[in-house]
């Protein structure tokens, strides 16, 4: 956690009191060259806390207030009606999720409690049918950002507040009420979707996409989460990833008009100029757009326990060879798979590790110790270059 606003290296605070650390993260990462606004934003990405249980939350008046606010919002949105359980029906369960959002100076911005359904307790063909929904491809995101850099388009980001709660629910789903908010023998008959339901994402995307298409946008046939509208010289392109919306346009008036329309349909949070989208940190100047995954890299270093390790100068040992027949098998295969998955995500902005990560991904079924050691070397290499990413020049030819 960030101790004070004067600390400009949030992840370095883990080792800040240990003068014996040989390789602190501050030796390879600095925020000093960032603009004041972007530096504050980069630090704010690391300052949030979570509460892990209802038993703790119910003892704190602040969390009680947050939970009551969530219940009131769900009732106002007509998400359910209270009724006796219908014969032959089995209610699903729910749980609370808690998060404290902090400001850059470590003061509390707000306490957020969210009620979610335990979707794993749903029964297929009774509580849900279809669950698939599309999300934008990352190659599309990079392509749009490259176009925006060259064309000088405006980039803005929207977040839909309680997105899933806006969509209608077609199935008959019953849910046990949350603790202390219901009477004995009563259940919640869900009228609208709820976070955690297996069909929640699908229902939300169906409602959002139909709203966008009705405004004259054309949905891409190769990427269903991309929408384009061209009127004369006015261009608006929309990319959707669940409740995160990225918009690029050369027409500010048309862009603002569309945002107002969306806000009238769904309650939006206008995040302003694009800075952070799906783990990608975006910094823009008049000459370029830079993409990196600094926070994701630092979080991975903390998780693996290599934050204070010696950085590697290259991502692989010289003359390294990988084989299924060399080395002892590792017992925690799932952890290896998870680690490689995280590294695959980092290849979005780090092409220098693409070959190695994809090579190591060939051993998912039976990884050996040398494969895990090679993955650790990649992570140590990433410590040396946490801010390195993609540079999209405004002067590139399309």
Model-derived regions: residue spans:
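Long, low-complexity, charge-biased intrinsically disordered regions
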Residues: 1-398
